C-alpha cells in the first residue's frame, strides 16, 4: 500500500511529496503550500482536456479502421482516401505562411549544428556521461571503434598498440587538414605550434605555415610560445589540439600532439520517456532527483574501472586565452533538454479525488511538466542555494514533448506549459517545446502543429521507428504491411523526412530552432555510421541523435564536412513532397513470401521484442544494447519495440501468421535471448517455464493484443506487467 499525503484534491505518494518539499522546492522561492495548490488546480483543470484528446485519437482510429474494412475499391484510391481523412478531421487545412517567434533561445539550439544525445534519466552514470559529452577525444573514439580497421597489425588488444595508434593519428591529421586546413601545408608535417601576433603559427621541418583561414584560430592554453593546447573553430564547432610531448602518445608525435578533442554533443535530451521504465512513484522520484542533480550541478556517481573507484561529476566550463589576449570561456557541458512523457499514460505517484476522478491516477505528462519545470529553475541560477552550474544562459527551460497527434495536442501542451509557468512564477514563454514529429497525424499537419507553438517551439525532430509504428497501426485494417527491413526504402519515409525539413525551414527555423533527425541504433558499427550518417546534415538537419558519447564525437566530424546552414539556404523555399506521398501506405503488393521468409521475419521480431522486454520487465531497464538474431548489438527502446510488435500484430490480423506461429517463435527465440544474457548475474531465464515468466507473457501480449493497443503504444502492457513483477517481488 502506497503511503500518501493529501494536497487539496490530490493524494501524493510520500516519496514524491517529500522529495519535492525537501529537495526540489528549496532555492526556488516558491512556497510549498502555494505550489501544491497550483499542482492541484492544473491537474483538476486540464485532466478533462487531456481525456478529450485521447478520445479524439480513438474516435479517428475507429473511423479509419471502419473505412478500410468496408472499402470496395482495390487498390486503395488515393483521392478517395485523402477526401475521407479530410472529412473526418484527420487531415486539416494548412495555415497561412508564418514565421516562428520563439525568443530567448541558447546558441546551441539556434546557431550551432551538431550531435544530440538521448539518455535515460534513471541512470545517473549515463546522464553524467552524456552531460559531459560536450567535448570528446577523437583519438579515443577512433582507437576504440571499428572506424579504424584492425587489419595489418592494428588490433585493439589489451595494451596500447602503436600500429593502431599511428593509424588513429593519421586519420585525425587528415580530419584537421580537411576541417581547419593550413595554407600550403599539412598537419602531418607539423613539428610544433605557437602563437605570434594573435595568429597561429605551425612549425614545419624547414619553414612554418598559417591557417588557410586565420579566422579559424579561436584561442589557446599555456603560453603563446609554448601552448598546451590550440583551439580552432569550423562551422561553429570547436576543435582542440592537445600538446604534451611527455605523454605516451605525444612522445611518438612529431609535434607532441597527444589528442584532438572535438566539441561533440552540443545538446542532450535527458529522457523520462521511451528509454526508461518508470511505472510508479519510486521510479519517478529517482528520475526527478537525477534531473535535480543535473540542474544543481551536484549529481555524482562512483565509478569503478580496472579495480579503481572514482567519483564522476559534471564538468566545469573551459577557459582559454583569446587570440589577441583576454579570456574566452566555452561551455563544458551539453545544453540539456528534458523529454517528458506524452499525453497517454497516467501514473499513480499522484491520484486525484476531484469530482468524477474517484482516486484515478494523474496524467503523467501533466506531472512531468510541473515537476521537471520546477526542478529546471535550479539550472537557471548560479547561487549557493541552486548550485554553481547553470544550464541555459538565456533563461529558458527546454522540454521535448513526444507522441503528439496533430495541432490540438500541441496547443494543449502549450496551455499546460503556460499554466505551469504561472504556478512556478516564471515569465510566460520560459518553457520551450521540442515537437517530436513521430505520429502520422502530426506529420500530415506539421505546419499547423508548429503554428500552435509558434512562440515556444525550439525543435522539430523525425523519429523513424515510432513514426513507422504509427503508420502500421493507423492502417492496421488496410492489409498486410511489407517486412520491417523494407520500411526504410518506402516512398512515405523519404517524403516524411523531406517534408519535416521543408516545413521547418518555411516556418523560419534556420538560425532560430533545431531541425533534427533520428537515432543511429547500431552501437558497435561506428564505421558504418561515419560513412552513412553524414546524410542527415546533408539533408538540412542541424542535429541528429546518437547513442553514446563516442558516437557523438564521431558524428561531430560530419558537421565539419557539411555547412548545414548553407544547405538550409539552398533548400529554403522548396517543397519536395506531396500529401499523397505522405499518405502512401506501405502495404505488401502481393503475399509472395516463402514460408522460410515469413518465419525469418517473425523470428527476427520476436527475438528483438523478447531481448528488450525481458530487461524492461525484470530489471526496469528501459534502454538496452540488445543483440539481434545475428548478434549485432542494437540500441533498443520503446520505439523499436513498437514497430516490431505492430508489424507482427498486423500480419496476425491479416492471416499471414497465426497466434500459434507467434507462440512457437517466442518459444524458439527465448532460449537464444537467455543465452545472449547468460553473463548477467541479475538475469532470469524465460525458458523453459515460459508461462511463469512475466516478461515472456508481456512480449506475447504486445503481439497478440497489438492491434487493440491505443495507437500501437507499448506502455500500457509494459507498465502493467512491470508492476505485476514488482508486486510479486515484494510479496
From Swiss-Prot:
Active-site positions on this chain: 339, 637
Principal subcellular localization: cytoplasm
Q: Which UniProt keywords are listed?
A: Cytoplasm, Glyoxylate bypass, Magnesium, Metal-binding, Oxidation, Transferase, Tricarboxylic acid cycle
Q: At which residues is Cysteine sulfenic acid (-SOH) found?
A: 623
Q: What cofactor does this one take?
A: Mg(2+)
Q: Specify the superkingdom.
A: Bacteria
Q: State its Enzyme Commission number(s).
A: 2.3.3.9
Instruction: Name the catalysed reactions.
Output: glyoxylate + acetyl-CoA + H2O = (S)-malate + CoA + H(+)
Q: Which Pfam families match?
A: MS_C (PF20659), MS_N (PF20656), MS_TIM-barrel (PF01274), MSG_insertion (PF20658)
A GO cellular-component term linked to this record: cytosol
Which molecular function term from Gene Ontology is one that the record holds? Answer: magnesium ion binding
Specify whether S-adenosyl-L-methionine is a keyword of the entry: no
Q: Which GO terms describe its biological process?
A: glyoxylate catabolic process; glyoxylate cycle; tricarboxylic acid cycle
Localized where?
Answer: Cytoplasm
Annotated TM spans: none
Cite the binding residues for Mg(2+).
438, 466
Q: Which amino acid positions bind acetyl-CoA, per UniProt?
A: 118, 125-126, 275, 312, 547
What is stated as this protein's family in its record?
Belongs to the malate synthase family. GlcB subfamily.
What is the designated name of this protein? Malate synthase G
Q: Which organism is it from?
A: Mycobacterium ulcerans (strain Agy99)
Amino acid at each position: 500500500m502506497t503511503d500518501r499525503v493529501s494536497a487539496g484534491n490530490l493524494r501524493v505518494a510520500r516519496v514524491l511529496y517529500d522529495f519535492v518539499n525537501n529537495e526540489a522546492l528549496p532555492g526556488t522561492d516558491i512556497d510549498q503550500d502555494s505550489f501544491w495548490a497550483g499542482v492541484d488546480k492544473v491537474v483538476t483543470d486540464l485532466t478533462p482536456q487531456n481525456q478529450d484528446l485521447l478520445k479524439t485519437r480513438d474516435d479517428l482510429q475507429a473511423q479509419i479502421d471502419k473505412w478500410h474494412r468496408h472499402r470496395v475499391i482495390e487498390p486503395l484510391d488515393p483521392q478517395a482516401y485523402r477526401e475521407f481523412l479530410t472529412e473526418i478531421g484527420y487531415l486539416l487545412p494548412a495555415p497561412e505562411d508564418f514565421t516562428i517567434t520563439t525568443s530567448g533561445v541558447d546558441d546551441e539550439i539556434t546557431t550551432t549544428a551538431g550531435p544530440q544525445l538521448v539518455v535515460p534519466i534513471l541512470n545517473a552514470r549515463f546522464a553524467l556521461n552524456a552531460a559531459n559529452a560536450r567535448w570528446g577525444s577523437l583519438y579515443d573514439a577512433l582507437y576504440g571503434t571499428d572506424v579504424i580497421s584492425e587489419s595489418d597489425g592494428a588490433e585493439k588488444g589489451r595494451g596500447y598498440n602503436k600500429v593502431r595508434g599511428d593509424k588513429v593519428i593519421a586519420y585525425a591529421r587528415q580530419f584537421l587538414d580537411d576541417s581547419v586546413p593550413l595554407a600550403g601545408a599539412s598537419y602531418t608535417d607539423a613539428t610544433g605550434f605557437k602563437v605570434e601576433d594573435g595568429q597561429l603559427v605551425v612549425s614545419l621541418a624547414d619553414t612554418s605555415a598559417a591557417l588557410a583561414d586565420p579566422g579559424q584560430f579561436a584561442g589557446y592554453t599555456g603560453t603563446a610560445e609554448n601552448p598546451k593546447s590550440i583551439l580552432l573553430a569550423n562551422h561553429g564547432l570547436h576543435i582542440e589540439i592537445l600538446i604534451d610531448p611527455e605523454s605516451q602518445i605525444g612522445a611518438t608525435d612529431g609535434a607532441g600532439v597527444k589528442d584532438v578533442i572535438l566539441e561533440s554533443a552540443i545538446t542532450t535530451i535527458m529522457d523520462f520517456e521511451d528509454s526508461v521504465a518508470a511505472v510508479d512513484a519510486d521510479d519517478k522520484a529517482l528520475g526527478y532527483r537525477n534531473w535535480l542533480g543535473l540542474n544543481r550541478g551536484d549529481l555524482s556517481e562512483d565509478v569503478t574501472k580496472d579495480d579503481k573507484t572514482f567519483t564522476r561529476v559534471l564538468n566545469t566550463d573551459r577557459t582559454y586565452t583569446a587570440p589577441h589576449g583576454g579570456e574566452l570561456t566555452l561551455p563544458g557541458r551539453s545544453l540539456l533538454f528534458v523529454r517528458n512523457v506524452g499525453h497517454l499514460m497516467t501514473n499513480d505517484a499522484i491520484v486525484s479525488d476531484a469530482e468524477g476522478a474517484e482516486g484515478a491516477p494523474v496524467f503523467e505528462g501533466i506531472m512531468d511538466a510541473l515537476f521537471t519545470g520546477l526542478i529546471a529553475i535550479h539550472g537557471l541560477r548560479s547561487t549557493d542555494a541552486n548550485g554553481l552550474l547553470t544550464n541555459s544562459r538565456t533563461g529558458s527551460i527546454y522540454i521535448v514533448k513526444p507522441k503528439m497527434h496533430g495541432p490540438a495536442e500541441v496547443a494543449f501542451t502549450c496551455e499546460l506549459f503556460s499554466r505551469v509557468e504561472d504556478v512556478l512564477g516564471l515569465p510566460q514563454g520560459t518553457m520551450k517545446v521540442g515537437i517530436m514529429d513521430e505520429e502520422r497525424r502530426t506529420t500530415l499537419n506539421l505546419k499547423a502543429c508548429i503554428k500552435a507553438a509558434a512562440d515556444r517551439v525550439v525543435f522539430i525532430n523525425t523519429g523513424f521507428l515510432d513514426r513507422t509504428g504509427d503508420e502500421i497501426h493507423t492502417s492496421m485494417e488496410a492489409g498486410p504491411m511489407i517486412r520491417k527491413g523494407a520500411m526504410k526504402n518506402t516512398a512515405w519515409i523519404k517524403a516524411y523526412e523531406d517534408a519535416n525539413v521543408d516545413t521547418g525551414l518555411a516556418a523560419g527555423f534556420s538560425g532560430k530552432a533545431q531541425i533534427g533527425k533520428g537515432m543511429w541504433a547500431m552501437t558497435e558499427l561506428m564505421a558504418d555510421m561515419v560513412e552513412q550518417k553524414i546524410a542527415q546534415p546533408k539533408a538540412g538537419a542541424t542535429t541528429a541523435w546518437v547513442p553514446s558519447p563516442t558516437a557523438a564525437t564521431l558524428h561531430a566530424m560530419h558537421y565539419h564536412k557539411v555547412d548545414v546552414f548553407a544547405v538550409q539556404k539552398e533548400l529554403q523555399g522548396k517543397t519536395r513532397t506531396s500529401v499523397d506521398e505522405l499518405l502512401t501506405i506501405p502495404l505488401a503488393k502481393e503475399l509472395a513470401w516463402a514460408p522460410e521468409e515469413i518465419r525469418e521475419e517473425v523470428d527476427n521480431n520476436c527475438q528483438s521484442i523478447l531481448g528488450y522486454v525481458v530487461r524492461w520487465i525484470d530489471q526496469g531497464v528501459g534502454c538496452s544494447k540488445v543483440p539481434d538474431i545475428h548478434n549485432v548489438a542494437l540500441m533498443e527502446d520503446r520505439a523499436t519495440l513498437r514497430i516490431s510488435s505492430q508489424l507482427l500484430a498486423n500480419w496476425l490480423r491479416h492471416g499471414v501468421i497465426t497466434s500459434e506461429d507467434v507462440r512457437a517463435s517466442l518459444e524458439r527465440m527465448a532460449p537464444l535471448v537467455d543465452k545472449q544474457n547468460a553473463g548477467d548475474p541479475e538475469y532470469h531465464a524465460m525458458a523453459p517455464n515460459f508461462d511463469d515468466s512475466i516478461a515472456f507473457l508481456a512480449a506475447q501480449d504486445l503481439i497478440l493484443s497489438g492491434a487493440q493497443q491505443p495507437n500501437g503504444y507499448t506502455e500500457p502492457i509494459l507498465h502493467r506487467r512491470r508492476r505485476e513483477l514488482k508486486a510479486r517481488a515484494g510479496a
